[in-house]
Design a protein with these regions (language model features):
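Conserved "turn/edge" positions that cap or connect secondary-structure elements
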Residues: 1-228
Length: 228
């Protein structure tokens, strides 16, 4: 699992595991660290700036971690045994050549949601500088503070006037934000035995996108999550 916490006044995040027993609350086994923001990105002298929720199978775990979650220049997808502070094996990395791409481009974005069955790792990846603009309409369901902030209707305690996300645009259709998303993206599978990465599908004539983009802005004066 992924855990967020604050240490010495600094926000931190990490990937952990815990052995569960058929008892109340899963037993009393402690949780163990796999990697966190005090772990060096393999092959670099840079610490992880973010880690994503892991996926575990066959006593192994895979997860994505980057130096910068929003604009990664280092990091990738990693494999590790379910053991305390294990050695990490790099499966796919930022900058690695995209399989099957004639331009020899490298990945500049990798998805946090990863499928894993103990051998094969499925993931989303993007590359290139080309982008297209989409509208992200403010959510109608979910956290009420986040909804209010997106719609410029959030009233903080002690304030006289409501505030809103400066990135929101409101018209007769409602409030929304404009987001640039990558044109070049695809779904890939990495074989941990052969160490080869294969393409399943790419954007082009048949597909425009492989992700559902949504607004997840952090609302100030509340305890909601980070911008995503």
């Amino acid at each position: 699992f992924k855990g967020n916490y604050t240490g010495d006044g600094t926000e931190k995040t990490g990937v952990y595991f815990r052995h569960l027993l058929p008892e109340t609350a899963g037993g009393s086994h402690p949780s163990f660290l796999i990697a966190n923001t005090e772990t060096l990105i393999p092959g670099t002298s840079t610490f992880f700036g973010s880690t994503a929720p892991p996926n575990a199978a066959d006593h192994k775990v895979v997860f994505a971690g980057f130096d910068d979650e929003l604009a990664p220049t280092l990091g990738g997808i990693y494999l590790a045994p379910l053991a305390p502070t294990p050695a990490l094996t790099t499966l796919v990395s930022i900058g690695q050549r995209v399989p099957g791409d004639r331009t020899k481009a490298g990945f500049n974005a990798l998805g946090e949601g990863i499928a894993f069955d103990g051998r094969f790792v499925g993931f989303w990846g993007a590359w290139g500088e080309e982008s297209r603009e989409i509208k992200l309409y403010c959510p109608a369901e979910g956290n009420r503070d986040r909804i209010a902030y997106c719609n410029k209707e959030l009233l903080c305690e002690g304030a006289d006037e409501p505030i809103g996300d400066p990135g929101s645009i409101c018209d007769e259709t409602g409030c929304f934000q404009l987001r640039d998303v990558p044109v070049n993206q695809g779904i890939f599978v990495h074989d941990t035995r052969t160490q080869r990465t294969h393409v399943l599908a790419k954007t082009g004539d048949e597909f425009d996108d492989f992700l559902f983009w949504n607004y997840a802005g952090k609302a100030p004066c509340t305890g909601t999550g980070p911008l995503g």
